[in-house]
Each structure stands twice: as structure tokens, then as C-alpha cells.
């Protein structure tokens, strides 16, 4: 009862907390889907000794062709930066004759560099955007292999051939994209046709926040069971340090002036870190437990410390 009374008194008098756990780790939250539009595919180029990273930003064709498709006088279609790699027959395309899931998996392992042909598609139903769809993959001899035929109800407006990119799978090895989310039918290929992708340095604290987000997936899974038939994503129950190496793929969020990286995240729509931990907030508000008698607040003086 004394603890309840003292806690109420702390609140009423805006006193310091008399007891406050470590709480030094950042918490995470489920991001708004609209925020995904600001994310830029990225690839790690160099691991720095101070814990920071050098990354390259892979902006698809937008540096060369612009961020919107404006054909035929239509309302402009924002173009997705990463290409869609359909994970099976579920989606806006179907396997080409003679191609199958086993061949697709063998040619598109996570983080593998691939050469591919792409078609620019206008989203056929909900949403108003354009996306690049992988239609061909090149084999080890440099021959293009037809992988997907795009459905007749999907309008295609442009194409790119022999594009080099990197496969990004958020589903764990061996799992389907739809096993992570039922409506998910695509993985991604990060690419940039500019010839000179922009390189930016990432501060150590941004990298630490990325690791915290990865850890949060495992913590969330411990608290909440998966739906029947679903599988955890690639970032669950893994050591965050294992995900960061030269060649690692992720998404970057830049500052408004695009001069620095403010966040690195593993998925377009998923968990994001709060900018400060509970302990940092408490310190800024000067409500952490006192460290010397001169800091005593009303609750400390009444109930002791």
C-alpha cells in the first residue's frame, strides 16, 4: 500500500521516480504503412571500426527516369524503387511453361546478385502506383530464362533488360512469402541502373537501432503466437550481428534534406524504433532516481530514498 501511495504522490507532485529499472533499450512500434514510401533499398558496402556502416542506396530506375510514370496523360504513377520478385504462382503473374518453384528458389537465394529483365506494370486494382516485375533471370552462361508471364489484366508500359540487382527475401530460407503474411506474394530485387549508386555513411547509433528492431521481432514472437500455418520472418530468433555484413540488404530512411541516414530497418512495413529509450526520456525530464541528496524531490523527502 505504501508503494501505491508513494507512486501516486510521485505523479501528483511531478517528483522523481524513487525506483526505476534499467529501461535503457529502445522500444519499438508497428509503423504506419504510409511511411514505407520514404524508404530506400540499401546494401552494405563497408563495415566501419566504430560500428557504423557505409551503404549504397539502390533507387531502381528513378535516378534515370524519374520517380513517377506519366504516360498517356494519366494521373502520375509513383514508381516503386525495388522490383517485385513473385514467390510462386500467386500474384499478378504465373510461371512460364517449364519453369517451377524449385528453379526459382535455386536462382534467387537471399542476397544473391542476379541479372534479370523487368517490366513496368501499373497496379491493376487497389492502390495507384507502378512497379517493376521480374520476368526473366539470366543463367550462369548469361542466357535469359523466361520465368514469369504477366497476367493479361495487368497493364505493362515499359521494360528493362539485363539489369543487375540483389535478391531480398524477408521470408526465411525455404518458406514462402505468403507464410509470413497471407496477402504477401512478392519478395524483392534491389537494383539501380544509374551506374553510380549514391553511397552514404551510417552512424553507429543508427546501426544499434537496426539491431534493436531485429531483436524486437523475436521478443514479439515470444509474447504472441503465430497464426496457424504461418511462419516467422527471416529476422526472428537470429543474432542481429549475423544479419550485418558486407552485402547485407535493408531499407534506409533519410533525413528531410537527404544528407544523412536516420533509420535502417529490415522491412518496408514492420517495426520501427522509438528515437529514445525510456531511460533517456526520464533523464531528459529529470525524473530518474536521485544520485545525491541535493536532487531529492517531494516524494523522496516524504517517503525516503
Ranges and model annotations:
Residues 1-305:
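Basic, Gly/Ser/Thr-rich N-terminal segments that form RNA-phosphate-binding interfaces in CRISPR RAMP
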Amino acid at each position: 500500500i505504501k508503494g501505491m501511495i508513494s507512486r501516486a504522490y510521485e505523479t501528483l507532485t511531478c517528483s522523481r521516480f524513487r525506483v526505476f529499472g534499467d529501461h535503457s533499450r529502445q522500444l519499438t512500434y508497428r509503423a504506419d504503412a504510409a511511411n514505407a514510401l520514404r524508404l530506400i533499398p540499401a546494401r552494405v558496402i563497408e563495415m566501419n571500426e566504430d560500428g557504423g556502416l557505409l551503404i549504397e542506396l539502390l533507387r531502381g530506375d528513378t535516378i534515370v527516369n524519374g520517380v513517377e510514370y506519366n504516360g498517356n496523360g494519366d494521373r502520375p504513377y509513383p514508381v516503386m524503387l525495388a522490383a517485385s520478385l513473385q514467390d510462386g504462382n500467386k500474384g499478378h503473374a504465373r510461371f512460364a511453361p517449364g519453369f517451377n518453384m524449385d528453379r526459382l528458389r535455386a536462382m534467387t537465394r537471399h542476397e544473391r546478385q542476379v541479372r534479370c529483365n523487368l517490366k513496368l506494370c501499373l497496379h491493376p486494382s487497389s492502390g495507384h502506383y507502378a512497379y517493376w516485375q521480374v520476368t526473366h533471370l539470366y543463367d550462369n552462361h548469361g542466357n535469359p530464362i523466361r520465368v514469369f508471364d504477366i497476367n493479361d489484366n495487368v497493364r505493362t508500359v515499359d521494360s528493362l533488360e539485363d539489369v543487375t540487382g540483389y535478391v531480398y527475401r524477408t521470408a526465411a530460407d525455404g518458406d514462402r512469402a505468403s507464410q509470413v503474411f497471407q496477402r504477401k506474394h512478392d519478395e524483392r530485387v534491389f537494383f539501380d541502373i544509374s551506374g553510380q549508386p549514391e553511397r552514404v555513411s551510417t552512424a553507429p547509433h543508427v546501426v544499434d537501432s537496426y539491431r534493436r528492431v531485429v531483436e524486437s521481432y523475436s521478443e514479439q514472437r515470444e509474447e504472441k503466437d503465430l497464426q496457424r500455418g504461418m511462419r516467422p520472418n527471416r529476422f526472428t530468433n537470429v543474432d542481429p550481428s549475423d544479419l550485418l555484413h558486407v552485402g547485407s540488404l535493408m531499407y534506409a530512411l533519410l533525413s528531410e534534406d537527404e544528407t544523412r541516414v536516420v533509420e535502417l530497418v529490415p522491412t518496408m512495413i514492420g517495426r520501427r524504433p522509438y528515437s529514445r529509450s525510456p531511460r533517456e526520456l526520464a533523464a531528459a525530464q529529470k525524473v530518474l532516481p536521485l544520485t545525491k541528496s541535493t536532487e531529492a524531490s517531494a516524494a523522496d523527502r516524504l517517503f525516503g530514498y
